[in-house]
Amino acid sequence: MIECYILAGGQSRRFGEDKTLFPLKRKPCIQWVVEQAQRVCDRVFVVAKEPQKYSFLKGVELLKDILQEQFALAGLYTALSHTDQDRMVILSADMPLIKGELISLIWERSKNKITLFKVKGKIFPLFGVYPKGVKSTLEEYLKGGGLRVMEFVEKVGYEVVEDVGPFSYAFINMNTKEDARVILKIEIL
């Protein structure tokens, strides 16, 4: 069984408003991510500080962040605490161009380590597969004041998938309004 946890707890500071709800061709950004996850995953969860604002999404389960702080590792911690599977897919809610094929690819390539995409030299820590076994290390990292996802995955160790075929366009995070304009120009949506 493939469980997917979409992390939607960011602050959207650079975007100026909640980017997960920003409309892209008549759909909120997060809905594009959810629909691709639903193509290939058995269960899809949205993890957020205020999950009720995603109640319009069909076929997903909403989870409230366990930790009060608003940062990506809080969502990851919630997902690791919730799952009863050995591993899970983690996606960021601000990547509307992701494709189900990429989710399937990283799932098939993952074993018992964190597995992430590396595209054009950049690691994407919020598009990958995480084993449940990293939860205790994450707890220690958080207790020590750690906040950065990349710092955490470097501490634990990870594997990468680099061959994304024709899907390199999918690795755009929507952090600014300019990013949204770029995404809207790509004829994939």
Predicted regions and their residues:
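Nucleotide and nucleotide-moiety/phosphate-recognizing core
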Residues: 1-135, 139-149, 154-171, 177, ...
